């Protein structure tokens, strides 16, 4: 319904005081409170398709802000706690919440496409910092307990955070419409965080293959714009992957 009728949700229909999307966003907490996690993710994707149909950029950005309010509140709370005590990012419940929030963002990005940039810009640097901390946590756990530790639920969820982060970035870049903006604002911190982590991860089992698919998607999308960064990408991923 959201896909086929998206324009109807963002324009005022006969008998309505405001577009239906406004009503959905103002009651979103009561709508999702009884849904399972997977249903919440599907709901967010559906609402994202509705918002993507809005033709006014300013109004659309305001809708996106309301739309992401709930996950952003939880995200901000965890990031705030982590800024005082990074060990919160080893807490199973916090890690589980981050997994769900990132999956929600992946679905929102899929639906919104390039306009998702307003949300991505809000969480981007914190998300890359979380990525680096998760890598350190995973490497420490493997060093202490061996590769078998990667089967534990907490470590699995830490790896999912890394995978969903890469999926989110690759998904948005592939849908973006401004290559120069992507290259200037999003690629430098990404390469610094992800490539360095991949290269220095001593245990092959701790490396995420999604790093390779993310880099491939970015190079494919940006083409000639990213040529200058290709040697850096090769230096970080080629030799250590083959080994």
PLM feature spans:
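Karyopherin-beta/Importin-beta family HEAT-repeat alpha-solenoid scaffold
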Residues: 1-243
């Amino acid at each position: 319904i959201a896909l086929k009728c998206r324009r109807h949700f963002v324009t005022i229909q006969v008998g309505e005081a405001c577009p239906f999307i406004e009503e959905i966003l103002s009651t979103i907490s009561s709508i999702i409170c009884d849904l399972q996690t997977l249903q919440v993710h599907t709901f967010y994707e559906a609402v994202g398709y509705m918002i993507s149909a809005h033709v006014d950029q300013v109004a659309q950005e305001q809708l996106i802000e309301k739309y992401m309010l709930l996950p952003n509140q939880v995200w901000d709370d965890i990031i705030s706690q982590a800024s005082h005590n990074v060990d919160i990012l080893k807490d199973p419940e916090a890690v589980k919440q981050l997994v769900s929030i990132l999956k929600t963002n992946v679905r929102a990005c899929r639906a919104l496409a390039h306009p998702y940039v307003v949300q991505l810009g809000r969480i981007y640097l914190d998300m890359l910092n979380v990525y680096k901390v998760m890598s350190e946590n995973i490497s420490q756990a493997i060093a202490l307990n061996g590769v078998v530790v990667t089967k534990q639920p907490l470590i699995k969820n830490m790896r999912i955070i890394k995978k969903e982060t890469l999926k989110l970035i690759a998904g948005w870049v592939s849908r973006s419409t401004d290559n120069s903006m992507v290259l200037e604002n999003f690629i430098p911190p990404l390469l610094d965080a992800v490539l360095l982590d991949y290269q220095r991860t001593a245990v092959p089992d701790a490396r995420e293959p999604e790093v390779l698919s993310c880099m491939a998607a970015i190079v494919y999308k940006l083409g000639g714009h990213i040529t200058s960064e290709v040697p850096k990408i090769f230096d970080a991923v080629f030799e250590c992957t083959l080994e």
